[in-house]
A protein has these predicted regions:
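Structural alpha/beta surface segment adjacent to cysteine/selenocysteine redox centers
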Residues: 57-129
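Short acidic/polar alpha-helix capping motifs at helix-coil junctions
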Residues: 6-9, 25-31, 93-99, 128-133
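Sec/Tat-exported extracytoplasmic proteins
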Residues: 51, 66-69, 101-105, 114, ...
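Conserved short hydrophobic patches within well-ordered secondary structure
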Residues: 5, 93-103, 107, 186, ...
């Protein structure tokens, strides 16, 4: 009897706790609604640039909150071409480098190596050969890199990054990086003003919006 009573009370308390937790999130404080329609599948997309110091610093934070995302929430990266003094063509090359990394098993290592090349080694990517060198250093066959970088699938993904960039810039949602957008509909407001700074808090907010 006691066990049944406890189970009944728990069943009542859990929905109330979940509702209370969700009610803590406020539009305009913790997130902004930037579109009417949401993506068909739950996702969070980070708009970033390899040239952005803040994006580089965020990598460690992402590595902490990403594992805490619900299994149905996919984390995606999208490279932009409007950061710093680098010309758009060079930055677009880096978008294509990300797209190439996306189809390789060493993806995470490659992304980390590119950030490290720019922000730790203080080295430059002046031409495609520089990008290739980083990929080869991470175990990617040189010929395979050449084929993948020019492949239709990689060019298509890179083009989509550009389209997404322009779309969200027009919406007024993408003014700087890093910017996180959930389901193509909600822009996260991270920082002191919203109080969402810790990895656990970020993952909870993403999960809430992704399943909203």
């Amino acid at each position: 009897m006691i066990k049944l009573l406890k189970a009944g009370l728990l069943a009542l308390v859990l929905p109330m706790a979940a509702t209370s937790f969700a009610a803590d999130y406020q539009e305009g404080v913790h997130y902004d609604v930037i579109a009417e329609r949401a993506t068909k599948k739950p996702e969070v997309k980070e708009f970033f640039s390899f040239y952005c110091p803040a994006c580089n610093n965020y990598e460690s934070l992402i590595s902490e909150f990403k594992p805490k995302l619900d299994k149905n929430v996919k984390f995606k990266k999208s490279h932009v071409d409007f950061v710093g003094v680098r010309n758009p063509e060079n930055q677009q090359m880096m978008s294509q480098a990300l797209a190439t990394a996306e189809v390789l098993p060493q993806k995470e290592k490659l992304i980390a190596a590119i950030f490290n090349h720019i922000h730790t080694k203080r080295a430059k990517f002046n031409e495609l050969a520089d990008v290739k060198d980083v990929f080869v250093a991470q175990g990617v066959d040189g010929d395979k890199f050449d084929k993948l970088f020019k492949s239709f699938s990689v060019r298509t993904l890179s083009s989509k990054m550009k389209r997404d960039q322009e779309y969200f810039k027009e919406k007024g949602a993408l003014r700087g990086v890093p910017t996180f957008i959930v389901n193509g509909k909600y822009k996260l407001n991270l920082g002191r003003e919203s109080g969402v700074t810790a990895p656990e808090d970020i993952s909870k907010l993403i999960n809430y919006l992704a399943n909203k």
